[in-house]
């Protein structure tokens, strides 16, 4: 059996297990990871490289930073402040989505989510609303906000790089032509109809540090202040990532280490704050994304779908197929891998049709950002699985309508703003 076929079998297995949850999500990920090694599709280094992926390192660091906010009670104090201004659950959801959406346009969407997840959990604790209803809008807003600027998401820069040899480019805010209407529509949706379909789970505290009932009266004031100062410093380091030349994950690690070294959080509590289910789920799933890439299975799927359109497909229909194909792929591969895979295919077909490559790539990028229906679609989705006590189906129920909204808006705006034959 060829490596491509084996990879597709593991993909099908993962989809079925993720949807049915007959076994835990993290266990499914590890079965796939180890299975790809046993079958010879990947070597050990490639299969387990996901566990030293920069996003996993960022997860670990920000779990500790978030844990410090909770251990000191600062997250609850921030929550109290926010709830004074947003009196209702709907108001909180709108406020969270607006703040996260705007921040994601200028800071990476993963970095934005990583910084604000502990804050939102604190808001949930003080407001009395279930965190499962606040965290999902947060990560969806992070994904939508990534399409407000050139630097909002890695896929945006990949598309820009693909255009460079052709002497073409996207403007800094050109993604917002499509991205901003989707963000606005998404916020309105979850403030109205979507409000009713958000998950409504009680959280499993276990021995997690994120204890909403803890008494913080004995915590020294300096610990609270220092935890907030380090959080803000970490955020600023992430915002100015390009200028200071330090990657997000390293900035997060510096913040986490400072919290431990200064005694704001103990080593024991720092380790307790790390959600291992999230780490195993994300790290293991990256092996599947790697296999789809190196075996050509992902390219095979794309080629078969695009090839079925024929030599001269309708521009609108072709745009729709590219958009939806990227939507599907990005929910099982990363946004970055999806755009990197699809960009050369789309460019080749666009040039063959004599179409504007920018039109096709914009559909590719926007579709590739619609990672709303699985917990593995983007790092932020995975980060909140444990905190929100989410199941796979929760993402599908809450995220699928958002994909429909994004598709409708894109198919209206793309032909007007980025015509195939300008």
Could you describe each region identified by the protein language model?
Residues 22-23, 41, 74, 129, ...:
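Helix N-cap/coil-helix junction residues
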Residues 1-60, 64, 177-303, 319, ...:
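Hydrophobic transmembrane alpha-helices of multi-pass small-molecule transporters
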Residues 27-32, 109-117, 136-137, 148-152, ...:
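Hydrophobic alpha-helical membrane segments of integral membrane proteins
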Residues 6, 127-140, 146-158, 162-214, ...:
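Juxtamembrane and boundary regions of transmembrane helices in multi-pass small-molecule transporters
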Residues 31-34, 38-130, 273-278, 282-353:
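Membrane-embedded alpha-helical segments and adjacent helix-loop junctions characteristic
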Residues 14-23, 99-109, 140-151, 237-243, ...:
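Transmembrane alpha-helix interface/packing and boundary motifs in multi-pass membrane proteins
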Residues 44, 131, 172, 248, ...:
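Alpha-helix N-cap/start motif
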């Amino acid at each position: 059996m060829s490596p491509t076929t084996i990879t597709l079998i593991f993909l099908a297995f993962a989809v079925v297990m993720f949807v049915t949850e007959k076994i835990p999500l993290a266990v499914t990920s590890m079965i796939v990871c180890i299975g790809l090694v046993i079958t010879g599709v990947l070597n050990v280094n490639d299969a387990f490289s996901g566990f030293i992926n920069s996003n996993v390192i960022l997860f670990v660091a920000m779990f500790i930073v978030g844990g410090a906010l909770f251990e000191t009670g600062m997250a609850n104090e921030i929550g109290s402040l926010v709830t004074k201004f947003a009196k209702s659950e709907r108001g909180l959801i709108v406020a969270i989505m607006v703040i996260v959406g705007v921040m994601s346009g200028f800071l990476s969407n993963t970095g934005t989510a990583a910084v604000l997840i502990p804050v939102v959990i604190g808001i949930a604790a003080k407001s009395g609303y279930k965190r499962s209803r606040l965290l999902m809008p947060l990560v969806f807003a992070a994904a939508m906000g990534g399409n407000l600027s050139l630097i909002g998401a890695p896929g945006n820069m990949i598309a820009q790089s693909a255009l460079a040899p052709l002497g073409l480019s996207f403007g800094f805010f050109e993604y917002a032509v499509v991205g901003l209407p989707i963000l606005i529509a998404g916020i309105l949706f979850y403030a109205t109809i979507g409000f009713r379909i958000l998950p409504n789970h009680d959280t499993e505290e276990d021995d997690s540090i994120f204890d909403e009932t803890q008494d913080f009266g004995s915590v020294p004031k300096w610990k609270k202040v220092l935890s907030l100062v380090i959080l803000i410093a970490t955020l600023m380091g992430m915002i100015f990532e390009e200028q200071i030349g330090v990657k997000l994950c390293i900035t997060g690690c510096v913040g986490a280490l400072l919290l431990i070294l200064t005694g704001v959080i103990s080593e024991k509590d720092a380790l307790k704050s790390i959600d291992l289910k999230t780490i195993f789920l994300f790290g293991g799933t990256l092996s599947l994304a790697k296999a789809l890439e190196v075996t050509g299975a992902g390219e095979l799927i794309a080629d078969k779908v695009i090839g079925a359109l024929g030599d001269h497909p309708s521009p609108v229909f072709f745009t729709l197929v590219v958009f939806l194909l990227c939507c599907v792929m990005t929910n099982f591969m990363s946004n970055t891998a999806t755009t990197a895979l699809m960009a050369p295919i789309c460019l080749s077909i666009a040039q063959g049709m004599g179409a504007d490559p920018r039109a096709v790539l914009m559909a590719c990028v926007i579709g590739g950002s619609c990672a709303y229906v699985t917990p593995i679609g983007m790092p932020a989705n995975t980060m909140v699985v444990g905190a929100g006590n989410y199941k796979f189906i929760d993402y599908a129920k809450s995220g699928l309508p958002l994909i429909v909204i994004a598709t409708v808006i894109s198919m209206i705006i793309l032909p007007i703003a980025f015509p195939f034959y300008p």
